[in-house]
A protein has these predicted regions:
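A membrane-periplasm/extracellular boundary helix in multi-pass inner-membrane enzymes
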Residues: 3, 179-185, 265-311, 324-329, ...
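Transmembrane alpha-helices of multi-pass inner-membrane enzymes
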Residues: 411-472
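Hydrophobic transmembrane alpha-helices and their immediate junctions
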Residues: 104, 264-266, 373-419, 452-456
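A conserved mid-to-late transmembrane alpha helix and its immediate loop/hinge
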Residues: 242-253, 354-392
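Transmembrane signal-anchor hairpin modules in multi-pass inner-membrane enzymes, especially those
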Residues: 1-125, 157-164, 223-232, 279, ...
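Long extracytoplasmic/lumenal interhelical loops at the membrane interface
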Residues: 306-321, 329, 333-373, 396
């Protein structure tokens, strides 16, 4: 059972637990009538305002009219530019405008998600050893604001409303990306590194377009439209996301799109069967994963050719070897949050000289966490993944609520994709990366669904046909 946080009154705690109850058909009808009327999701000024910080995170804080090396854009100021500091303060302030509106609920979620909150706290605690203290503090503030914004979203909107938010945001950014690639190729195509035919759209790089298109695709697939208009938007968005993925030329995204399709198809096939069939589904997915690993070990050249990579994973293995040497120098505390990749300054210069490649990340999210926060940061991330998997499996095996199962399946998909993505890309706890915030959102959602399941055991036996997920 969930426990009451010390800083929240008993009334608030009971009210919060009440919001986790399974919704009845009557509740669903009332919600449908409400959303159809003036109190609907898009009649709220705050919902439209929320799209602004989400768009900022979706674009990684980079103007779509910039088409330079993504790695050097991230570190070009080395943390010294006044405008960079000012923009961080503004985005933190923008996030806090929303957070303050529901500060009690945000505090309650902070108590439930201690690991998520402790990551930026740890970054702040060890900032004295950072290679660039000002960059660490300002970036940490943005990360903290983004996390609190996620808590606000999860306390304010139902699961389907969250999906609708990402549907609208995704439709705007993906359609804009397609238009940029076709009409403004000097901005919409990745002209760096010999990828002139690859689309990047309004995003910072082709891999980022592929990453976000896939995440938006999962939201569109999981969303249940409430009107014919949103039904059309959903179908169009699925098509646009697949087009963006195809023309991003991002090999990792190709592979993960296949993984997601297999995941969604398998769970959809077993959803109407008995609970033990979920266990069978997990076994099938494990067999598929083990088969891929076996091919990678026994026939690596064949697998690499399918992914469009060579035996060094397009130079990634050389980067990882060089990064391991830097980690060995500071394994406990790292080099400071967002303070390792400083271009031709500090320890990152040694790696750039070694691999003869201008870098802004280790091409592996877990290695980047080690570089920045040492062992402590890595432990937090691994525990967060572990708890997310525990919560997901618990809900999938015990819940009989169709709406809850659909929510858990979407959250779990985001967690799985984030895990695999960060094996050869990097965005774990990035301060301005929407994928990072969606991962945090998924972890929060899985925790809330498990608490809901524990708080209302009847949900295990009952199987209501209508449910709304999280409270508005």
């Amino acid at each position: 059972m969930c426990t009451k946080p010390s800083f929240v009154s008993q009334e608030l705690f009971l009210a919060t637990v009440q919001t986790l109850r399974p919704a009845s058909a009557g509740d669903h009808t009332r919600l449908a009538n409400s959303t159809a009327g003036n109190s609907g999701l898009w009649s709220r000024v705050s919902t439209w305002g929320l799209l602004l910080p989400l768009l900022y995170f979706a674009l990684d804080g980079v103007s779509p009219f910039v088409n330079g090396p993504a790695s050097m854009r991230a570190v070009s100021t080395g943390g010294s530019a006044l405008m960079d500091r000012l923009s961080n303060v503004l985005i933190l302030g923008g996030c806090m405008i929303f957070v303050i509106q529901r500060h009690h609920a945000v505090l309650w979620l902070s108590e439930q998600m201690k690991l998520v909150i402790f990551f930026p706290i740890l970054a702040l605690l060890i900032c004295p050893v950072s290679q660039q203290v000002t960059r660490t503090i300002s970036s940490d503030a943005v990360l903290f604001g983004g996390i609190l914004l996620v808590f606000y979203i999860m306390s304010r909107y139902t699961v389907n409303e969250v999906l609708e938010l990402f549907l609208v945001l995704g439709a705007a950014t993906i359609v804009a990306s397609i238009l940029f690639a076709l009409i403004l190729p000097q901005y919409g195509r990745d002209l760096m590194g010999g990828h002139s035919s690859a689309w990047k759209g309004i995003f910072s790089a082709k891999n980022y377009l592929g990453n976000m298109a896939l995440f938006f695709l999962t939201a569109a697939v999981s969303y249940r439209p409430r009107t014919s208009l949103f039904r059309s938007v959903r179908v169009s968005q699925i098509l646009f996301c697949l087009i963006a993925i195809a023309f991003s030329r991002a090999a990792t995204t190709y592979m993960l799109t296949t993984v997601y399709i297999a995941y969604a198809t398998t769970l959809n096939a077993v959803r109407g069967f008995r609970k033990k069939d979920y266990f069978v589904a997990f076994i099938l997915l494990f067999v598929i994963f083990a088969s891929v690993v076996a091919v990678a070990v026994l026939q690596p050249d064949f697998l690499f050719s399918l992914l469009g990579k060579d035996a060094t994973l397009t130079g990634r293995t050389e980067i990882w070897d060089a990064v391991a040497g830097s980690i060995a120098k500071r394994p406990l505390l790292g080099y400071g949050y967002q303070a390792f990749w400083l271009g031709y300054k500090g320890e990152s210069y040694r790696i750039i000289l070694t691999v003869t490649w201008a870098l802004g990340q280790a091409q592996n999210g877990f290695l980047d966490v080690m570089l920045e926060l040492g062992v402590g940061g890595l432990v937090i991330v691994l525990l967060l993944f572990g708890f997310a998997f525990r919560d997901a499996v618990t809900c999938l095996l015990r819940s009989h609520d169709d709406s809850q199962l659909r929510a858990v399946e979407w959250y779990f998909a985001i967690v799985i994709l984030t895990l695999i993505y960060n094996l050869d890309e990097s965005f774990l706890f990035e301060p301005r990366h929407l994928g990072s915030l969606m991962f945090v959102l998924a972890c929060v959602g899985l925790k809330l669904e498990r608490l809901r399941l524990q708080s209302f055991p009847a949900n295990r036996a009952a199987r209501p046909t209508l449910s709304t997920g999280h409270p508005a």
